[in-house]
From Swiss-Prot:
This is Thiamine-phosphate synthase. It comes from the Bacteria. Binds 1 Mg(2+) ion per subunit. 4-amino-2-methyl-5-(diphosphooxymethyl)pyrimidine binds at Q36, Y37, R38, D39, K40, N68, T106, K136. Mg(2+) binds at D69, D87. The lineage of its organism: Bacteria, Pseudomonadati, Pseudomonadota, Gammaproteobacteria, Pseudomonadales. Pathway: Cofactor biosynthesis; thiamine diphosphate biosynthesis; thiamine phosphate from 4-amino-2-methyl-5-diphosphomethylpyrimidine and 4-methyl-5-(2-phosphoethyl)-thiazole: step 1/1. One of its GO terms (molecular function) is magnesium ion binding. It catalyses: 2-[(2R,5Z)-2-carboxy-4-methylthiazol-5(2H)-ylidene]ethyl phosphate + 4-amino-2-methyl-5-(diphosphooxymethyl)pyrimidine + 2 H(+) = thiamine phosphate + CO2 + diphosphate; 2-(2-carboxy-4-methylthiazol-5-yl)ethyl phosphate + 4-amino-2-methyl-5-(diphosphooxymethyl)pyrimidine + 2 H(+) = thiamine phosphate + CO2 + diphosphate; 4-methyl-5-(2-phosphooxyethyl)-thiazole + 4-amino-2-methyl-5-(diphosphooxymethyl)pyrimidine + H(+) = thiamine phosphate + diphosphate. One of its GO terms (biological process) is thiamine biosynthetic process. It comes from Pseudomonas paraeruginosa (strain DSM 24068 / PA7) (Pseudomonas aeruginosa (strain PA7)).
């Protein structure tokens, strides 16, 4: 599967009160190719249950599930994992999950971190925040010039994250970004139908790029 398109990331606060599964399915119907389950709570039983349900939805829609910051849960479910810089060893996650698993790495605004992630076995790297982010307002800012430097040096998919909207995504795609990671601009919606409409709009940006 080529890693290109909309990368949907869940948020436990945005998707509470029973919204998680219907909103995620709407995003998948709208064309999301990757889904990251991001839940920082300590309720292991709920996290396992929700992640298993999301895996079924992804399989149904031809997408791939990635678990944030929990290689053991990812291994249990046979899915991928995304690791931040403080979330543990990327090479250990690769060894645990196997050669075929998707393993992503947060690299903030650092090309050096990205090159190290590649050496450690990452499937893709994520740069950002590119714009003001509701999820991580204190994250280091990344510039579009970083993408110009990264594209010729990194021979694997590049993800952009951080406050990205339908208005700002085209400029990032034009700079060679393969995946646009979105949380609020996708899931902060009044209905599942609106989530699907937004997902289709994001996905369409890659068809014209």
């Amino acid at each position: 599967m080529k890693l290109r398109g909309l990368y949907a990331i869940t948020d436990s606060q945005l998707l509470d009160d029973g919204r998680l599964l219907p909103y995620v399915e709407a995003a998948l119907r709208g064309g999301a190719r990757l889904l990251q389950y991001r839940d920082k709570s300590c309720d292991q039983a709920r996290r396992l249950r929700e992640a298993a349900s999301l895996r079924e939805l992804c399989e149904r829609h031809g997408a791939q599930l990635i678990v944030n910051d929990d290689a053991e849960l990812a291994a249990r479910l046979g899915v991928g994992v995304h690791l931040g810089q403080t979330d543990g060893s990327l090479s250990a996650a690769r060894a645990l999950l196997g050669r075929q698993a998707l393993v992503g790495a947060t690299c903030h605004a650092s090309l050096e971190l990205a090159e190290q992630a590649v050496a450690d076995g990452a499937s893709y790297v994520a740069f950002g925040r590119f714009f003001n982010s509701s999820t991580k307002p204190g994250a280091p800012a990344a510039s579009v010039e970083l993408l110009d430097q990264a594209r010729p040096r990194l021979h694997l998919p590049i993800t952009a994250i951080g406050g990205i909207s339908l208005d700002t995504a085209p400029g990032l795609i034009a700079r060679g970004v393969d995946l646009i990671a979105v949380i609020h601009a996708l899931f902060a919606a009044a209905s599942a139908a609106e989530v699907e409409r937004r997902a289709r709009a994001f996905s369409a940006l890659f068809e014209t790029a």
